[in-house]
Amino acid sequence: MMAGRRPILVAATRQHVGKTTVSLSLMNGLKKRFDKLGFIKPVGQQHIEVQDDEGNPVRVDKDVELMKDYFGLDHLNFPDMSPVIIPRSYTKRFIDGEITAEHQYEQIRKAYDNVSSVSDQVLLEGTGHVGVGSGVNTSNAQVAALLGADVVLIANGGLGSAFDELDMNRAMCKEAGATIRGVIINKVQPDKLDMVRDYLGRLLEQRWGVPLLGVVPDLPFLS
């Protein structure tokens, strides 16, 4: 059904920059263009227990339950929406050889194939900053490259500090072979919105050839 559309992966420069909030906004926008949306959190760290379609208990990332319920994604199965969970001691097990990179990749590929086969467009939500998961070879950048996803990178704040963080995360994307297609700046002081939109927009175009897709003000009700 996807007709060759590339998935979109929402990544961030660090934790707590509003990645899930932006993902909700993007899903809401995509819903106006596509009949059936897919959502996957390829690698999750904060998991909860839910019931699958057959009533069996399964562990999924907490954001997956939110997206499934809020957008009514009844055509998707929980296990496909959250293929890899990283609980405590997971990295130790990976180093000991109990878990392999290829096994994780197979889980992620299978989940994506299942979701994309019944969806018109798929949104992937990353975990933490771009490099999170590197210790087990499943960083956001590696997952984006694995699935051929277009990366939308989110950062907080103003001008210089935001670009510094963006550039550091871009380096990890380049190393993994992932492509950044756009940037969103979240939690910008309201009186600096126009300045950030103008100057950071020009800087991104000059340095990366990438558009600034949006600038979100730091307002209490948005938090």
Indicate where each model-derived feature is located:
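Flexible phosphate-sensing "switch/lid" loops adjacent to ATP/NTP-binding sites
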Residues: 1-223
